[in-house]
């Protein structure tokens, strides 16, 4: 038994200068797990609650001392003495103790930090790397794959202070044979994009996720700049590198008139018109994945979009599904989208996250493991992507240490598996729904 002997919570700072919760779980034998909760900017309305203090005299109301107190008191008292290797039991104890549907009592930030720290401590007690332990918890011990990165190299929407409506323009280095090669291709395109933007007299300041955040005449302009950068780097768009977008449509959907208002372009679309706008972009550019291409509540619009694009484009539900199995189940039954974005803190525990990934895979949906715009040096999502053989990861651009921490962890894992004589496959484009 890997007995929990101590649980510690503290307030640390994330990549946006806001507080977040970090937890330590200590076991008998001196094993320790350390984990921090991330934080989103464009959030789905049905996400588990991130508990903030609301005390305007500290961190403009964004302190997390209440959540930290929950870790140090109620949660610690409930799980000290328990077996850390019973992850589902530890998570359920915290969920039951919180007693709310959306974890609003302790905060998903408190519960998640402890959940992940517990898994790390348990892995250490078994002498396993975290990805191997996650695979065991997932019922897929020894089954790994290296994820295809979706690299957000132009930031807009809520992630940048510019006039670009679509939140993320991403590249996928599908021509790579290994994760390390994919990162090299991504870095080369990123540096060439900086040159392209500079030559046009545009800003090369970066947004929350490390991508550039220039003012552009249109969303299509972002794709044109990326195309030029890919070619300047010596790669072929559509063969070596494909494109993906996160529209985060809920951020520019007007609930009062049901229109998608792209203020940066001065255009408004009905739900169906917006799907056809995206369809035209897909005809012009090799866009193989679109995330949140409709408002989270516009299920009719999503059903139409799935009918129009779903056979050839990966349609990822983020704000739509919020890593929640109840909502995902309904989406699967109604044929909404064909992929789910996986964010630990949308649901608030490792056990529930693994359940969402399993449900998606069982239904033939893909699962894309994702960071949040507010991150720390915690790289757990890298281990999650490998340990569940998810096939895809979204963790920002080729700048900002909070993003690079995840990529560097993936490099370490890929190398460790190669050295052990059990290299993990890198599926590339085959990992993307509709592209196999």
Curated annotation (Swiss-Prot):
Its main location: cytoplasm. This is Enolase. Keywords: Cytoplasm, Glycolysis, Lyase, Magnesium, Metal-binding, Secreted. GO terms for molecular function: magnesium ion binding; phosphopyruvate hydratase activity. Pathway: Carbohydrate degradation; glycolysis; pyruvate from D-glyceraldehyde 3-phosphate: step 4/5. The gene is eno. Component of the RNA degradosome, a multiprotein complex involved in RNA processing and mRNA degradation. The active site is at residues 209, 343. Catalyzes the reversible conversion of 2-phosphoglycerate (2-PG) into phosphoenolpyruvate (PEP). It is essential for the degradation of carbohydrates via glycolysis.
């Amino acid at each position: 038994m890997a007995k929990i002997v101590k649980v510690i919570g503290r307030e640390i700072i994330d990549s946006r200068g806001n507080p977040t919760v970090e937890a330590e779980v200590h076991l008998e034998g001196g094993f320790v797990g350390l984990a921090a909760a991330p934080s989103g900017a464009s959030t789905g309305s049905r996400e588990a609650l991130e508990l903030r203090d609301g005390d305007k005299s500290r961190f403009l109301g964004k302190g997390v001392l209440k959540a930290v107190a929950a870790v140090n008191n109620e949660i610690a008292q409930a799980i000290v003495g328990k077996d850390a290797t019973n992850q589902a039991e530890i998570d359920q104890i915290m969920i039951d103790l919180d007693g709310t549907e959306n974890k609003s009592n302790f905060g998903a930030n408190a519960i998640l930090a402890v959940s992940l720290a517990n898994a790390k401590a348990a892995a250490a007690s078994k002498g396993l790397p975290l990805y191997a332990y996650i695979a065991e918890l997932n019922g897929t011990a020894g089954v790994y794959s290296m994820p295809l990165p979706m690299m957000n190299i132009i930031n807009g929407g809520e992630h940048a202070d510019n006039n670009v409506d679509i939140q993320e323009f991403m590249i996928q280095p599908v021509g790579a044979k290994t994760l390390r090669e994919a990162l090299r291709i991504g870095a080369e395109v990123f540096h060439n994009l900086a040159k392209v933007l500079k030559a046009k007299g545009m800003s090369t300041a970066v947004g929350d996720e490390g991508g550039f955040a220039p003012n552009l005449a249109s969303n299509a302009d972002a794709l044109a700049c990326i195309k030029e950068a890919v070619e300047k780097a010596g790669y072929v768009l559509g063969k070596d590198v494909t494109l993906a977008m996160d529209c985060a449509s809920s951020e520019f959907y007007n609930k009062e008139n049901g229109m998608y208002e792209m203020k940066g372009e001065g255009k408004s679309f009905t739900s169906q018109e917006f799907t056809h706008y995206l369809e035209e972009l897909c005809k012009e550019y090799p866009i193989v994945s679109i995330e949140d291409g409709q408002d989270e509540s516009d299920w009719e619009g999503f059903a139409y979009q799935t009918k129009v694009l779903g056979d050839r484009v990966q349609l990822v539900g983020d704000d739509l599904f919020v890593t929640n199995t109840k909502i995902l189940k309904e989406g699967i039954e109604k044929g909404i989208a064909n992929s789910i974005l996986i964010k630990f803190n949308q649901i608030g525990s490792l056990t529930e996250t693994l359940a969402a990934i399993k449900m998606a895979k069982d239904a033939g949906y893909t699962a894309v493991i994702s960071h949040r715009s507010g991150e720390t040096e915690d790289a757990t999502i890298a281990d999650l992507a490998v340990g569940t053989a998810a096939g895809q990861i979204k963790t920002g651009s080729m700048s900002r240490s909070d993003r690079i921490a995840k990529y560097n962890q993936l490099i370490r894992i890929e190398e460790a598996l190669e050295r052990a004589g059990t290299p993990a496959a890198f599926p590339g484009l085959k990992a993307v729904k509709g592209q196999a």
